[in-house]
């Protein structure tokens, strides 16, 4: 119980220190992002980037409609509608298409023209800079796709004959680890990659389109060096005629908590095994400074934990293994994981033993003052380069960041407010605070997952779990204390946002 109370006190102390410096202010949206709403409910967001005059102009029309809306007679409709929009016809000539989607030759990123998921469809365009006439054509095409598609037999057949260019999120909804993550969720029965099955009923498809493709469920995002006054005027001109209104709200996608039981999954598309330690928790929006501080504290702690493991791995006999770390938010759940790539199943147990020993030591001893000082120095250096980094951030990255913030309920703040809050936070943070957060995070339930390559015998996950638990279990006295504190240890987790 004492450890839990101390963690709560230290976390509260940091919040108090930071909040006193910034007066616990609400996060103010970055005014550089202009926003508007038309009379029909259509919304738009625009970021002009004079600091990036040579970048392409990025457009995303996000419709809050995906495969989760389909019933048994409508399977594949959400995926087929973009195919219909992309089919060559009077509205989109073959000459226009390359300019709207082809990136520069030196770009490594591939932009799919449309992405369909469970709860959204995103129409994506990337235009050459300084081509205002092409921007007008792009806005017109987006408007026509959003509310003026034709459903005659000729159009339907043309769409069926064109190769499917529509991507999905996630990229592979049939990935074994993703399917396992969806267990207990209605999403499992609504694959966004599912295409329509013949015969295609045009009337049913059109009704689905009119029901869910309504202007009050659409947002247009634009990032680039454009004439904002002209663009805003054009948006009103081409999107105001859209009609319709949602008569019923769309169902919200949800995920169940990740089961703590160890699991092994076979994946035919991998050539090595991957051992993962996964932490799953609720995600909470970030709209005020205290929530942002909680997020930063958890995020820096996870980063410190990963770099500690990385340095230990480089000094061990397992240094040929690759170590990765990621955090993602999926439908109000946050999932962070440490992944170790190993050549085969025989290397799994040494990997489990290594990670458990290092994490157990880190939980009990914490970071050293030297490690903490290095972390603060690195973060301070990043903060000092904030405006230079922002000036170098390309329009496609700025767009991705905006969409992620919108999806996760995070208020995008101006660089000036970010710098002020971040500096106050870094100045208030101490080694003891970070180590208490580290101890708390490593006391949470962890799911052990193993992705195996085809042809291998299935790993004994029960034995691997026992190996992990034996190392991670504290000595007798802390066990009793942890057992007494168990009901309260989850409380800080419920209130602390975690990494995106």
Pin down the residues of each PLM region.
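An aromatic/glycine/proline-enriched structural segment found at the starts
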Residues: 219-276, 280-284, 455-456, 462-490
